[in-house]
């Protein structure tokens, strides 16, 4: 890894990270695998709230406390800056032990990478840091009832309100980790079209839609 620019990722450190990831997956996540299948998430139609299976939140809290949510992310935003290959090892262990649980941090990872690459500076400050820290989670909202993942046909619209604010309306389905009680806020990255967008996939834009609104500062 040193030849790839990861000077701190020596053999001793990498081995220690892998060993701890294995311990966490085996002793914390694997025992919850059956519970995830038998109990699953619970939806309360009266409130719209979703609760995760017993033990899932406690496991997620331990995952966050261990710094795993930021393992491969940029240190500028609170990450540890480890190689993506090491993150792949972690993901394989987590998902092998408990795939249902592993879907929660998996979607956050995708949201983090999108914001790192394309987010504005204020978006990185407001949304990226809590996602890397694991105090919030993220999703990717693509699929719609009428077209599945044929994104060229999506109908979700974003109407401009001000120069940097939009009113987003539409219906998304099959959103992994779209609602839960692991953290107080969920950052949804939503694919939608502006009123003057060209037809097809080329007219799609990406919008940051948090479950609860937050101020820039």
Question: PLM ranges: what are they?
Answer:
Residues 61, 67-70, 100-104, 137-139, ...:
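Beta-sheet entry/capping signal
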Residues 77-81, 110-114, 122-123, 146-150, ...:
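Flexible loop/turn segments at secondary-structure boundaries
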Residues 1-103, 122, 126:
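Amphipathic, small/basic residue-rich leader segments at the start of a protein or domain
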Residues 36-37, 44, 104-108, 116-160, ...:
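Internal maturation/activation junctions in enzymes
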Residues 96, 113-121, 133, 137, ...:
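Short, well-ordered loop/turn and helix-capping segments at boundaries between secondary-structure elements
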């Amino acid at each position: 890894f040193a030849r790839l620019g990861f000077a701190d990722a020596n053999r001793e450190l990498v081995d220690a990270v892998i060993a701890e990831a294995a311990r966490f997956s085996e002793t914390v996540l694997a025992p919850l695998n059956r519970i995830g299948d038998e109990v699953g998430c619970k939806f309360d139609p009266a409130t719209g709230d979703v609760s995760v299976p017993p033990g899932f939140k406690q496991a997620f809290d331990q995952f966050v406390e261990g710094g795993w949510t930021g393992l491969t992310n940029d240190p500028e935003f609170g990450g540890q800056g480890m190689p993506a290959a090491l993150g792949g090892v972690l993901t394989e262990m987590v998902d092998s032990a408990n795939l249902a649980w592993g879907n929660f941090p998996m979607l956050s990872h995708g949201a983090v990478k999108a914001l790192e690459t394309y987010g504005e500076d204020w978006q990185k400050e407001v949304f990226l840091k809590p996602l890397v820290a694991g105090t919030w989670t993220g999703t990717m909202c693509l699929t719609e009832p009428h077209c599945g993942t044929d994104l060229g046909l999506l109908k979700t619209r974003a109407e401009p309100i001000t120069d940097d604010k939009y009113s987003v309306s539409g219906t998304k389905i099959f959103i992994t980790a779209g609602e839960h009680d692991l953290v107080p806020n969920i950052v949804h990255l939503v694919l939608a079209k502006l009123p003057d967008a060209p037809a097809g996939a080329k007219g799609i834009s990406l919008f940051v839609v948090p479950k609860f609104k937050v101020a820039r500062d």
